[in-house]
Amino acid sequence: QFHSLRNLIVSLNLEAAELLELTQWKSDAEVEAIPADPKLAEDLRDECADILLLLLLVAEKAGIDLIAAAQAKLRKNEHKYPVEKAYGSRAKYTELG
């Protein structure tokens, strides 16, 4: 009952929020220093692992091959953001012209 697709997606987002919380109210420099701090690095690893494990459960429950999905998404992005138009730009694909 607790591993419904909906509950897994909610849990995945809650774990992502915990990852985000590690950076809350910190400067970019403080965030970049997290991996050098043993306690914070462990917290970062734990949150990343929680997210990965839940993502795997979501994908399994939904019948998604994550490798194939990632490859397909990269191909879509190549079409949306062609290098010759998008390189060095923060523009959304609809604004690249």
What is the role of each PLM region?
Residues Q1-C48, L52-G97:
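Flexible "arm" and connector segments at domain edges
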